[in-house]
Amino acid sequence: MKVLITGTSQGIGKAIAEHFLNHSHTVIGIDRQASGIIHENYTHYQCDVRDYKHLPDISDIEVLINNAGTQNEQDIDTNLKALIHITETYGIQEHIHSILNIGSASAHTGAEFPEYCASKGGVLAYTKNVAMRIAKYGATCNSLDPGGVLTPLRKWATPEEIAEWAYFLTMVNTFCTGQCILVDGGESINYNFVWKD
């Protein structure tokens, strides 16, 4: 399949791209940084997902994975607005098979920085919107929401673990759609209730 992934130069995005390449898919990456992947089936576009005028002209994407994200003053612009633009540009079309948004456990818990958790909360709502709109193509759209703190399992998720989830949700799954899948090692169930003073 023809797979477009944003944020592929490092971390989760790079691991996802490599996982798809290892399964013989054609992968296109978009990232502000130079490519960290050398593979005959990989094409890299170095540009900012927020720079709408300079995004590459790519057609007939079958799998779209919105991974590009940040934790700084550009949270809303990168994590939400650019994700929406990328999806509307490349994902809402008849050739689409699956769209996956990389969210965050923070969207469920409200933890971390205000703008960050708000941007990821927007991703959850938008995921459901897209799932309804691409159902007519027989396509799915879900959000994969990793945790980012020390969890009850007392370990961190690796980028490779998240890549396996991404592959399952886009390539194996055909029926789960509009869902926000928490892969957080129990972060969201490690809830500490606080009584009012």
What do the predicted segments below correspond to?
Residues N67-N72, G186:
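Conserved NAD(P)H cofactor-binding loop of Rossmann-fold oxidoreductase domains
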Residues A135, T140, C176-Q179:
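Short, small/polar-rich loop/turn modules that mediate ligand/substrate recognition or access, typified
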Residues S9, A17:
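N-terminal Rossmann NAD(P)H-binding glycine-rich loop of SDR-like oxidoreductase domains
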Residues S98-G122, T127-K136, G148-V149:
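Catalytic loop of short-chain dehydrogenase/reductase
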Residues P159-V183, S188-I189:
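C-terminal substrate-recognition "lid" of short-chain dehydrogenase/reductases
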Residues T140-L150, L182-D184:
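Conserved SDR Rossmann-fold cofactor-binding beta-strand/turn motif
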Residues E18, I84, G121-K128, M132, ...:
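Conserved active-site helix of classical SDR/Rossmann-fold NAD(P)-dependent CH-OH oxidoreductases
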